[in-house]
């Protein structure tokens, strides 16, 4: 079977979202399917590309900005010419008459089409005026767009989204790309926590740092450190985090590494004992979510904590659930939980073998093409 994986943005192999897309592409291929990636490149002019081949060049200026959001005929033409059977679209919250027409044309010639919505619900992620204007258009057309699809792929527990049936999967793991952590070699009276993300307010890292401020309000025998890895999404998050650090003199205990990947990221993980997931999903109205980060922590072989509902991990012995509210994270609770851990990194990693990307993407194929099972 021939699959076209369609995204409406750029593709950078070092970017976290692009890495996930690479894993999904490889998973389709591992299941025996010929798979092609269509993405936008804006390095010189605005160009739509499939596997390195330019299928549309929109130029620059206002015309290019408009065409990249409205011209999808080149995608359909490519799909027809190359006899694509299945189109897997990653949503960019861009439901409009042009995306609807694209899907209708694909369906008319017999292609199966699904759309992945990475995070749902997502309306509360739109907080400034420009973003809210973009959301208005999506709200107007998304139910009609969903009606054209064969299904919506979700990492939530919703059976339907925008009136369309869902295929519920988990964020997966590409085990070949995630090295298990090595043993930490820091002093026994230290606990090193790590949080890896493009840092948004819904990650709730401020709650962890507020918790450290309370923890260090008195003299402590156990020294707890928080390694924050990743860029801040906006100055708002960065200013909030740095303010809490400075006001509480936590510069020695909260280490802002910036964005790291590859061996540099592996080296930081090797220093760390405990993973920090999301502690602020309630801020954007999300209760159920299966984040990629939780799975990466497990693949690394470290225990971790989060505050949402993740049915793949909620009952695991190496997972600590925290309240989904605005209270500072209780650092002593983390210390006591960590002291009781008996699972080895290998045991933690082996517990999620069923969450490979190959298995997750096979579930999509089996749902869309049941006769091929």
Where are these regions (language model features)?
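N-terminal subdomain of nucleotide-sugar transferases
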Residues: 1-43, 82
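Conserved donor-binding/catalytic core segment of Leloir-type glycosyltransferases
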Residues: 4, 185-203, 209-212, 226-227
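Nucleotide-sugar-dependent
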Residues: 15, 94, 203, 263-268, ...
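A charged, aromatic-enriched C-terminal amphipathic alpha-helix characteristic of glycosyltransferases
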Residues: 16, 325-329, 336-371
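Membrane-proximal helix-turn-helix segments that form the acceptor-binding/catalytic region
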Residues: 26, 73, 97, 101-109, ...
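Donor nucleotide-sugar binding/catalytic pocket of nucleotide-sugar-dependent glycosyltransferases
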Residues: 139-181
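Glycosyltransferase donor-sugar binding loop
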Residues: 225-240, 258
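Nucleotide-activated donor-binding/catalytic signature segment of Leloir-type glycosyltransferases, i.e.
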Residues: 238-267
């Amino acid at each position: 079977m021939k699959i076209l994986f369609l995204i409406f943005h750029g593709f950078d192999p070092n970017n976290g979202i692009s890495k996930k897309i690479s894993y999904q592409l490889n998973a389709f291929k591992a299941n025996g399917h010929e798979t092609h990636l269509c993405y936008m490149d804006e390095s010189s002019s605005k160009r739509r590309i499939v596997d390195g081949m330019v299928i549309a060049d929109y130029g620059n200026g206002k015309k290019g900005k408009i065409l990249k959001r409205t011209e999808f005929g080149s995608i359909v033409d490519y799909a027809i010419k190359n006899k694509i059977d299945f189109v897997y679209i990653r949503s960019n919250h861009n439901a409009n008459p042009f995306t609807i027409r694209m899907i209708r044309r694909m369906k008319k010639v017999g292609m199966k089409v699904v759309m992945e919505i990475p995070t749902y619900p997502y309306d509360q992620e739109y907080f400034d005026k420009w973003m809210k204007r973009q959301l208005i258009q999506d709200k107007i057309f998304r139910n009609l767009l969903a009606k054209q699809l064969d299904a919506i792929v979700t990492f939530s527990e919703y059976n339907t989204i925008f009136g369309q049936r869902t295929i519920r999967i988990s964020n997966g793991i590409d085990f070949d790309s995630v090295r298990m952590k090595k043993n930490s070699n820091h002093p026994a009276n230290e606990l090193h926590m790590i949080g890896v993300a493009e840092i948004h307010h819904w990650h709730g890292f401020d709650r962890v740092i507020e918790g450290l401020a309370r923890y260090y309000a008195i003299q402590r025998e156990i020294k707890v450190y928080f390694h924050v890895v990743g860029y801040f999404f906006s100055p708002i998050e960065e200013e909030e985090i740095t303010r809490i650090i400075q006001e509480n003199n936590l510069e020695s205990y909260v280490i802002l590494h910036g964005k790291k990947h590859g061996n540099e990221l592996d080296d930081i993980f090797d220093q760390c004992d405990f993973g920090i997931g999301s502690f602020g999903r309630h801020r954007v109205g999300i209760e159920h979510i299966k984040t990629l980060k939780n799975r990466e922590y497990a693949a690394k072989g470290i225990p971790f904590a989060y505050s949402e509902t993740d049915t793949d991990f909620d009952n695991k012995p190496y997972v600590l659930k925290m309240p989904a509210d605005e209270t500072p994270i209780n650092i002593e609770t983390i210390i006591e939980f960590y002291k009781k851990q008996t699972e080895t990194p290998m045991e933690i990693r082996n517990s999620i073998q069923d969450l490979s990307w190959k298995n997750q993407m096979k579930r999509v194929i089996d749902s869309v093409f049941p006769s091929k099972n």
